[in-house]
Every structure is written in C-alpha cells, then in structure tokens.
Amino acid sequence: MEPSISGHAPAPARIRSAGHWLRRELLPVLALLLLLGTARASFANHYHVPSGSMQPTLQPGDRVAVDMSAYGVRVPFTRHVLIERGRPQRGDVVVFDSPADGTRLIKRVVAVAGDRVELRDGHLSINGVPMADAADPQAERFGPRVARLDLANGGGPDILDARVPAGHVLVLGDHRGRSVDGRWFGFVPVDALYARALAVYWRSGDGLGWRRL
C-alpha cells in the first residue's frame, strides 16, 4: 500500500515557513518602529501648551514643534548627551524639566551663564542694558528675536540683582504677571533643557500653520 499524500506541509515545515515570514515581514516593521521611536525621543517631537504663561507668544492649547537635538543628541529617554551641538541663546523658547518638581514646562531663556540680571515691573535688563525694544515698550529684543510681552497683570516679582551661574540659564514667561518661572524655582541647568521650540504648527481657531518662534 502506498502512503497517502496530504495537501498540507508537515508541521515542522509550517513552523519554519512561519518563522521565515516573521523574519522577512515583521522584523523590518519592528525595526522601523524602533527607529521612529528613537528619532522621536532624540531629534524631533511636539509639545502641547497647557497654560497662558507664555502669552501672547503662545496660547493655551497650541501645538508646538520642537527640536530635541538643538543642544545635543542624547541617549533616548535620558539626559546623557552623546553629541554636543549648540548652546542655549537669549530669546530661545525652550521645553525643560522644572527644577522644583520635574514638571515639563515651556518658557523663554532670557539670560545665560555669566549674565547679570535685573527685572523691574516686568522689564528686563541684562548686564545693565535694558532689553526693551526701542519701538515697542511691550516687547523685548534678543538679537534678531523680538519677544512680545503681556504686562496686563503687572510684571510679577522683581529680580533686583542676580548672576546666572555656570551651566545654567534663567527662564521667564512672556506673560510676566502670570508665569511661574525662574523667579520661583531658580536657575535651570542646561542639561535639563529638553528641546528648543521651533514653531506653532496648530492653534485653536486658526488650524494648521507654521508660526515660527
């Protein structure tokens, strides 16, 4: 009697075939997802603005594109810098971890290491030079950048005289009277800066766009 011939491959062959399919089809997809996740954690991301502390520059609910490699390429999900790049500059809008409780915030760098800072009635002076824009007292000029201020609720606490220590920056909100910022939690270590904000890419009522910061 001749053995019967089944139309199905033997079980070991089916297992080998399934394993080959997984390696050929699934592993590249997993590798791509891992690559995208790593890129998101190390290079580009977005931030959802939770409050009005940066008005009028940023509105509550704004979606902001950020460059996570602006100050260095890090090991994903850590503060360890693999490749150093730029240093924070006055006027940069940055996302960082609060020294007080680790909450992720977005504010403006107004002073860097070595700067002497005074803030009176919401108006900033760096190294004895007022930052107010000559054409608009409700704005401050940081080189080519102009930051619009909201002083409708006053300027908040003053800074009478302070010097930024090495490896740190001072951050303030553009809405000076309603911002919990460096006046409350002190100077921010540079390695706590998570990203530099590039642009608002979505705003309620306006929809998609690219409003550069």
List the predicted regions and their residue ranges.
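Single-pass alpha-helical transmembrane signal-anchor segments
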Residues: 29-39
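Soluble "head" domains of membrane/secretory-pathway proteins
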Residues: 2-25, 38, 42-213
